[in-house]
Amino acid sequence: MTDSTVFSHKPTLPGDLVVLRPVTEDDVPALLPLYEDAEIMRLTGCHTHFEEPALRKWYASRGAQDDRLDLAVVERATGRVVGEAVLNEWDEENESCSFRIVFVPDAVGRGLGTEATRLIVGHGFEALGLHRISLEVYAFNPRARRAYEKAGFTAEGVLRGALLWEGERVDATVMSVLAPEWAAQGAAG
């Protein structure tokens, strides 16, 4: 991948349960629970408290970023924004990036994350030409790790004591999926 504008196009990715579309400032009210829920903050290892004006500014700027892709996850059945899926930390020379996904509490456990992950990761490999997509998941989030494994991610190693949370050191597992593995999954599934 040599086109430095590869992330400039912000697509809409339709699925059966969800639609991923470019996130906007107007999505902030629906996404506020991501920044207010103590359990979400713990599971994502986020120590920072965000105020709504700062979030509005952040989300308003996402469409102009040419080094990342921030998409809102919209539940088809309700039309409600229930989370976000992001490809970021793009390494152009090595055709790789990081992935993160997060949902408001009442959207968890209904298959929305599985489909959203398949949509954005598939886009990364099939449309953007990435070779590797990686993530980190904390040891106290086994549910997310199982979801990532289900989506085809493989554990590569452990970052020992990567997070200090409430006085305790927490390991993070590095996981990734490679383009050939993704293609083989598609052929098998």
Regions found by a protein language model. Give the residues of each.
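Conserved phosphate-binding and hydrolysis motifs of nucleotide-dependent enzymes
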Residues: 83, 141, 152
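Conserved GNAT acetyl-CoA-binding A-motif
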Residues: 126-136
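GNAT-family acyltransferases
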Residues: 1-107, 169-170, 177-189
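Conserved acetyl-CoA-binding loop-helix of GNAT-fold acetyltransferases
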Residues: 109-124, 142-150
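Amphipathic alpha-helical recognition patches that constitute DNA-binding helices
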Residues: 30, 98, 102, 115, ...
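A cross-family signal for key residues in well-ordered alpha-helices
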Residues: 32, 118, 122, 176
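A structural signal for the main folded, soluble domain(s) of proteins
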Residues: 125-126, 179
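Conserved catalytic-core motifs of GNAT/GCN5-like acyltransferases
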Residues: 23, 134-137, 154-174
